[in-house]
Design a protein with these regions (language model features):
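Residue-level signature of mid-helix packing/kink "hotspots" within the transmembrane helices
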Residues: 16, 44-52, 136, 241-249, ...
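Extracytoplasmic gate region of multi-pass secondary transporters
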Residues: 18-19, 196-248
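Interfacial helix-cap and linker-helix signal at transmembrane-aqueous boundaries
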Residues: 25-26, 57-58, 144-149, 223-224, ...
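Helix-to-loop junctions at the C-terminal end of transmembrane segments
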Residues: 50-62, 247-259, 343-344
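Structural signature of the two symmetry-related core transmembrane helices
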Residues: 65-79, 262-276
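Cytoplasmic helix-loop-helix junction between adjacent transmembrane helices
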Residues: 93-131
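Helix-loop-helix hairpin linking two adjacent transmembrane segments in secondary transporters
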Residues: 127-175
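A late C-terminal transmembrane helix in Major Facilitator Superfamily
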Residues: 135, 309-348
Length: 376
């Protein structure tokens, strides 16, 4: 459980610290918003594409070996980014790192779900929370490091952390059971899988991710128009991610009381309202709202991930998680590109407003999902 959380924190931190590096790379390589979004898309796209193959590799070589090698590749990719001298070299390095990170979500979340069975919603919330810890720590750390050293040296420093985590996983991650009596019992209870329900959940996850990734792509530039400094950009992102971590716990509590649908309505509606507030408010009040925006922005995902086992049988858990993460990560890769080119056409403010509209599009889908959820 705790090694899965450690892996999640590292890989999510690696994924989201790209946002803090985008302004640096824009200056270094003279990139447009669309090109910056493509850089983010290279990492996320590679990660999404290799989710299902990572699951097959784990069945052949074991979860521990596959996750350890993937973590090592993610670290080495960032080390390679630190020595890249061209935009193409940077793209290749990010593809290597994204490929390594493809192992983490399906294997670590599947392991937690298998170990805890029907009681996995709570542990999965802790697992998701650990990812937000990484999202809070690494973007802030890289932003601080690039103020005291060249950005290339900063990447080498964070890659060393990944190498150490890979070694710990290889040495200490226990074998993951493929099934036991409690899992088999839960599997029988879930024998009537809701494919249409899973499809709706999948679509909601894709749109929710599009909102999150699209907004995070533009947030540094939106704040830059308000006069924020480079060092404070990392702090602003950390505020969003810290709020997101709190949102995981908040939505777990909220979901237990008002249900999945009520929670989704609260978080997506709140996200749309707060995005508009951050756009139009001055810098100081906008910064104050960032933790709450993060809670709304990331809170939905915790409820969605915990619902995946409810809509599939236990013997298909890892495949269901792989499919779900493939869709959400693919959305994370493609949506910033779409919003990025939209930003080139209509500006940062217009594209950011489009992310708020996407959040509102989730609401009718959530209503359609209601009949497919367990009432117990």
């Amino acid at each position: 459980m705790w090694l899965s959380c450690t892996a999640h924190a590292l890989h999510d931190g690696y994924t989201d610290m790209i946002y803090a590096l985008l302004p640096v790379w824009q200056t270094e390589f003279g990139l447009s918003y669309g090109a910056l979004a493509i850089l983010r898309g290279v990492y996320a796209g590679t990660m999404a594409t290799l989710q299902l193959p990572a699951g097959r590799l784990a069945r052949k070589f074991g979860t521990r070996a596959t996750l350890a090698v993937g973590t090592l590749l993610a670290a080495l990719g960032y080390a390679a980014a630190g020595i890249s001298g061209t935009l193409l070299g940077l793209c290749v390095a990010l593809a290597i790192s994204g490929g390594g990170s493809s192992t983490q979500h399906p294997l670590a979340s599947g392991a937690v779900s298998r170990v805890y069975g029907r009681n996995a919603r709570g542990p999965l919330s802790i697992y998701n929370f650990s990812g937000d810890l990484g999202k809070s720590a690494l973007p802030a750390a890289i932003s601080l490091l690039i103020t005291v050293m060249p950005w290339r040296h900063a990447l080498w420093a964070v890659s060393i952390v990944g190498v150490l985590v890979a070694a710990v996983i290889a040495l200490f991650l226990p074998s993951i059971p493929r099934g036991d009596s409690s899992m088999q019992k839960a599997s029988r209870q879930h024998s009537n899988d809701s494919r249409s329900g899973f499809s709706l959940l999948f679509t909601i996850g894709v749109l929710d991710t599009a909102v999150r990734m699209g907004l995070l792509t533009f947030l540094p530039f939106l704040l830059k128009t308000k006069g924020i400094s480079q060092s404070m950009t990392g702090t602003a992102l950390a505020l969003v991610f810290i709020g997101g971590a709190a949102g995981k716990f908040l939505c777990g509590w909220l979901g237990a009381r008002v249900g999945v649908i009520g929670t989704v309505f609260a978080t997506e509606g709140g996200t749309a309202a707060l995005i508009l507030a951050v756009i139009y408010l001055p810098l100081t009040p906008a910064m104050v709202l960032l933790p709450l925006l993060g809670a709304m922005l990331n809170g939905t995902s915790s409820v969605l991930y915990g619902t995946v086992p409810e809509l599939t049988s236990v013997d298909r858990t890892e495949r269901a998680f792989a499919l779900f993460y493939t869709g959400t990560i693919a959305s994370g890769a493609l949506s910033p590109v779409v919003y990025g080119f939209l930003g080139d056409q209509i500006g940062v403010h217009g594209a950011t407003i489009a992310t708020a509209a996407t959040a509102l599009a989730v609401l009718p889908l959530a209503l359609a999902l209601r009949p497919h959820l367990r009432t117990t």
